[in-house]
């Protein structure tokens, strides 16, 4: 399976399970969205270091999580790279450039918009107030 097919398959699986996750999780109205690119060195660095810890965290268990990570970084903000259900979030992003970007969406509205590897810690701090 090539990388693009794998990416689309994982996105489809994430969206397909969204309804089930919403009823099982404590804060279904909170989403975290990672925006990156497979050809983005800072994104690869985040994936290697912070991503595994994020997936193992208690916070991860309490949110809906989505990844927008096309093969080419320049496509990260293209509408076709986003699942249809998340396109209203894309419309809210004020500056559609720069990665890695971390969004927190609460009640269909972006409440945290952090850019860069160093901003991941700010994202986690922001997230805590929506999970309490």
Feature names for model-found ranges:
Residues 1-12:
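N-terminal secretory signal peptides and thylakoid transit peptides that target proteins
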Residues 36-39:
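Short pre-active-site segment immediately N-terminal to redox-active cysteine/selenocysteine motifs
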Residues 59-83:
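Thiol-based oxidoreductase modules, predominantly thioredoxin-like and allied folds used
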Residues 117-132:
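Thiol-/selenol-based redox modules, centered on thioredoxin-like
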């Amino acid at each position: 399976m090539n990388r693009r097919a794998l990416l689309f398959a994982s996105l489809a699986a994430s969206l397909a399970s969204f309804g089930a996750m919403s009823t099982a999780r404590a804060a279904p109205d909170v989403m975290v969205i990672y925006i990156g690119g497979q050809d983005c060195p800072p994104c690869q660095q985040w994936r290697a270091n912070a991503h595994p810890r994020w997936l193992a965290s208690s916070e991860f268990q309490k949110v809906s999580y989505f990844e927008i990570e096309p093969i080419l970084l320049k496509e990260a903000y293209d509408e076709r790279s986003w699942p249809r259900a998340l396109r209203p979030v894309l419309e809210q992003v004020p500056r559609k450039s720069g990665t890695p970007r971390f969004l927190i969406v609460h009640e269909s509205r972006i409440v945290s918009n952090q850019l860069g590897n160093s901003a991941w810690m700010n994202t986690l701090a922001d997230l805590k107030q929506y999970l309490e």
